[in-house]
Amino acid sequence: MSTTDSRPLLHVVAGIILNSQGEYLLSSRPAGKPYAGYWEFAGGKVEAGESETAALQREFEEELGIRIHAAVPWLCRVHSYEHARVRLRFYRVAADQWSGGIQAREGQAWSWQKAGDFTVSPMLPANGPLLKALSVPTELALSADGALCGENGMGAYRVVPYASALPQEANILLPVGALQTSGRPPQAESVWVEVADANEYRAAAAHPATDVLLWRVADGSDAQAVLEALAEGCAVPLAVAA
């Protein structure tokens, strides 16, 4: 996004729809729209007086014929296109939170895809960074060697502290101070940045090398700060550790 773009923000919502196999729904933009043929997570503009959830429900009914019963706020990004400057709020919709058969009501194509193994292209520019974010597991456990371990649609997922990382490790965890001093580790496919308070969170969130944030919560005030950050909207996944 250009920092000099002063155009008004267009408020847009998009849905990350999952099926029972853990796959994500992508659809192509129909003919006649900007970026026709590009793949995206479906959604659309929030109308005046409309809530984000209501807009999400309306757009999916209009475009794909499915009904959304519940949705969880996820990431929030601002992106400048040639035709508009948009604020995109992404919602995750689990397999039991929607119903109906998918219909291409605008003549678009659609496809179920696995996180980390997307086979359709090209992707809409604002949606591209989400592909890496979707590979982050929703639950992680601390292993005996200090790594964070979980699973995604592609199998085992492991995050290793930078100080003990081997050259083949893809996901690296480092403190925000180390990120600011040394930058992105050259071997890292995904950089996790550890923060402990709101100031560190803001510094890490603003750094272009940050792929995932890990916020260690020590008390109630930390928990409140996390809730405020989530309400404001995070551009990258935020993991919380007690």
Residue ranges and their predicted role:
Residues 100-159, 224, 232-235, 239:
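Nudix hydrolase/Nudix homology domain
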Residues 2-24, 45, 76:
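Conserved N-terminal beta-strand and adjoining loop/helix that marks the start
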Residues 1-5, 77, 98-99, 118:
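Short, P/G- and charge-enriched loop/turn segments at secondary-structure junctions
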Residues 41-73, 114:
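The catalytic Nudix box helix
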Residues 34-38:
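A conserved beta-turn-beta hairpin within the catalytic core of GNAT-like acetyltransferases
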Residues 77-101:
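Active-site-adjacent beta-strand/loop module that shapes the phosphate/pyrophosphate-binding cleft
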Residues 142-145, 153-221, 236-242:
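Catalytic beta/alpha-barrel core
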Residues 16, 26, 88-92, 112:
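Conserved hydrophobic/aromatic beta-strand scaffold that supports enzyme active sites
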